[in-house]
A protein has these predicted regions:
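Gly/Pro/Ser/Thr-rich low-complexity, intrinsically disordered segments predominantly at protein N-termini
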Residues: 1-183
Length: 183
C-alpha cells in the first residue's frame, strides 16, 4: 500500500482564506435556512452535517452548564467556528478565556482555537474523524480537547498526549457520584 502526503497551505494563508470564505458563507441568507451544521474543508467547499440528535444537544447543554459553573470568567459557546489547517470546523462546545475572546474581535470565526474544545461524539463519527478533529484543534491552538461519548463519558486530551485522567483546566469536572457519566 502506498502512502499519501497531503500538502497544506501555510497557516497564515489558510487562515486568511478560511476567514474570507466564512464571511462569504455568512453573507448569504440562504445558508441561515439550512438545518444542521455547516463547516468547510481546506478548499472552501461546504460540508453539511445533519441536525444533531436530541441526546447530542442534551450533552452539549450539560457541558455548557458545567463549564459555566466550574471555570473562571471566560465565554462558553456551542457550535463554535474555528479556522483550522483543514478549513473551518465547528466544535460542539468551547471555553475561551477573556483574552482570546478579545483577540477574536469582529471576526466571524476563531483564528486561534479556544483553550478548551469539546466534541460530542455522534453515532456517525468514526474514530479517525474524531482523531483528525482533535489534531486540528490542537494545531489551531487549543490547550485541551475533550470528547463526550454516547453515554456522557468524557475523555480529556492535552497536546500530543494520551488521554488525561482529568482536565488540567477544570479538575472539578468529575463524574456524578456512583456513575461513569460526567453529564
Amino acid at each position: 500500500m502506498s502512502s499519501v502526503t497531503l500538502e497544506f497551505r501555510p497557516r497564515e494563508e489558510q487562515t486568511a482564506f478560511n476567514l474570507r470564505r466564512w464571511d462569504e458563507i455568512l453573507s448569504e441568507p440562504a445558508w441561515f435556512k439550512v438545518d444542521g451544521r455547516i463547516e468547510t474543508d481546506r478548499h472552501g467547499r461546504i460540508l453539511l452535517r445533519p441536525p444533531a440528535a436530541p441526546r447530542h444537544g442534551r450533552f452539549q447543554a450539560k457541558i455548557i452548564t458545567l463549564l459555566t459553573k466550574l471555570m473562571p470568567p471566560g465565554e462558553v459557546l456551542p457550535e463554535c467556528p474555528i479556522s483550522t489547517a483543514d478549513g473551518v470546523r465547528a466544535a460542539d462546545v468551547v471555553w475561551v478565556s477573556q483574552q482570546r475572546w478579545r483577540e477574536l474581535g469582529n471576526r466571524a470565526c476563531f483564528v486561534q482555537a479556544p483553550e478548551i474544545c469539546v466534541e460530542v461524539i455522534s453515532p456517525g463519527n468514526s474514530e479517525e474523524e474524531i482523531r483528525e478533529k482533535i489534531d486540528l484543534y490542537f494545531d489551531a491552538g487549543a490547550q485541551e480537547v475533550w470528547t463526550c461519548g454516547a453515554f456522557g463519558q468524557m475523555t480529556f486530551f492535552g497536546p500530543g498526549s494520551a488521554p488525561l485522567d482529568k482536565s488540567r483546566f477544570c479538575a472539578d469536572f468529575q463524574p456524578k457520584s456512583n456513575e461513569r457519566s460526567y453529564c
